[in-house]
Amino acid sequence: MAKRDFYEVLGVERGASEADLKKAYRRLAMKYHPDRNPGDKEAEDKFKEANEAYEVLSDASKRAAYDQYGHAGVDPNMGGGAGAGFGGASFSDIFGDVFSDFFGGGGARGGSRGGAQRGADLRYTLDLDLEEAVRGTTVTIRVPTLVGCKTCNGSGAKPGTTPVTCTTCGGIGQVRMQQGFFSVQQTCPRCHGTGKMISDPCGSCHGQGRVEEQKTLSVKVPAGVDTGDRIRLTGEGEAGSMGGPAGDLYVVVNVREHPIFQRDGKHLYCEVPISFADAALGGELEVPTLDGRVKLKIPESTQTGKLFRLRGKGVAPVRGGGAGDLMCKVVVETPVNLDKRQRELLEEFRKSLQSDTSHSPKASGWFEGMKRFFDDL
């Protein structure tokens, strides 16, 4: 099935800013994340689709290539990538439950013609609790990746031997093919763009120069991160081939849903249930914050839905600036499971209000409006 346009996937215009892209991705990531949709294959596919779109459009060079050439500009299998790896299957594809696409990757990318090639970038989704994201933390992760083979020091050749120059391309990694009136340059089909051939491969890596390994890494997460933020670990991606530099690892943050708070940028929101009596007479109650409990004064005649702002009780942004606010929305609860005496008291209270609508201004206005509506019919 043909891929959808990346801008369409994120629901943004082609000229969208970086902030708009991030906001759109964050919304989709929160909506379709597997933690929120266990067993939902469609949601999982949409989550991966959003990841792929964001990884391309959030990178200036990849976005430029995509804008000019479409999917072909960022697809290594359509002329933009480098040589094959592990029998044509990328290690990151093998571990697709942990990693999504390379950040523009194939077996390796960014390498020079015929020789050393940079390793692929990798992506790791890091799930955090809201408290961890707000305060910052250090976590240990295990990343399946490719590392340089120690037996052959990454050459792919059996110790004591060396790779030889490819006779098909003469060591440049590219060949020219005649197609009608046109001559096109393509990756050498024999050496896969490396410019070298291995006649006696290393027994440990089978000539690949790289082996599979679970790498354990410590990641320092700064305070204030949010869903969609990326932490770059330079050189922690896949090892390069033929002595090329390693790629990078991008740790993408996903903040789990919190049972009390909802986050919007640097502000937090929560609902606070209050009793009918406290709403009418006023009172004081404790509300939770990420720093502990605080007192909240409820004035008399408080209506459900009223917002109370606790300044500075939100989140300090990761890029600096003052902390946001905590917005508490009160919800007046109707009393239930009343005993006989409580029902009698409420009945007396109701009777006392029947002749005086000033105690319920909204209800009074509503009934007056309804009366005028029927009078006009």
Swiss-Prot record:
UniProt cross-references to InterPro entries, sorted A to Z: DnaJ, DnaJ_C, DnaJ_domain, DnaJ_domain_CS, HSP40/DnaJ_pept-bd, HSP_DnaJ_Cys-rich_dom, HSP_DnaJ_Cys-rich_dom_sf, J_dom_sf
Please provide the record's keywords in A-Z order: Chaperone, Cytoplasm, DNA replication, Metal-binding, Repeat, Stress response, Zinc, Zinc-finger
Q: Name one GO biological process term.
A: DNA replication
- What ranges cover the CXXCXGXG motif repeats? 149-156, 166-173, 188-195, 202-209
- Pfam families the record matches: DnaJ, DnaJ_C, DnaJ_CXXCXGXG
Which parts of the sequence bind Zn(2+) 2? C166, C169, C188, C191
| Tagged with keyword Cytoplasm | yes
| Domain J: residue ranges | 5-70
Q: Which cofactors, by name? A: Zn(2+)
Q: What is its main location?
A: cytoplasm
> Which parts of the sequence bind Zn(2+) 1?
C149, C152, C202, C205
List zinc finger spans: CR-type: 136-214
Single GO MF descriptor:
heat shock protein binding
The entry's free-text remark on the cofactor is: Binds 2 Zn(2+) ions per monomer.
Tell me which PROSITE patterns the record gives.
DNAJ_1, DNAJ_2, ZF_CR
GO CC entries: cytoplasm
Q: Is Metal-binding set as a keyword in this record?
A: yes
Tell me its family.
Belongs to the DnaJ family.
Q: Subunit info?
A: Homodimer.
Relate the protein's function as given in its record: Participates actively in the response to hyperosmotic and heat shock by preventing the aggregation of stress-denatured proteins and by disaggregating proteins, also in an autonomous, DnaK-independent fashion. Unfolded proteins bind initially to DnaJ; upon interaction with the DnaJ-bound protein, DnaK hydrolyzes its bound ATP, resulting in the formation of a stable complex. GrpE releases ADP from DnaK; ATP binding to DnaK triggers the release of the substrate protein, thus completing the reaction cycle.
Q: What is this protein called?
A: Chaperone protein DnaJ
Q: Which organism is it from?
A: Pseudomonas aeruginosa (strain ATCC 15692 / DSM 22644 / CIP 104116 / JCM 14847 / LMG 12228 / 1C / PRS 101 / PAO1)
- Which gene holds the coding sequence for this protein? dnaJ
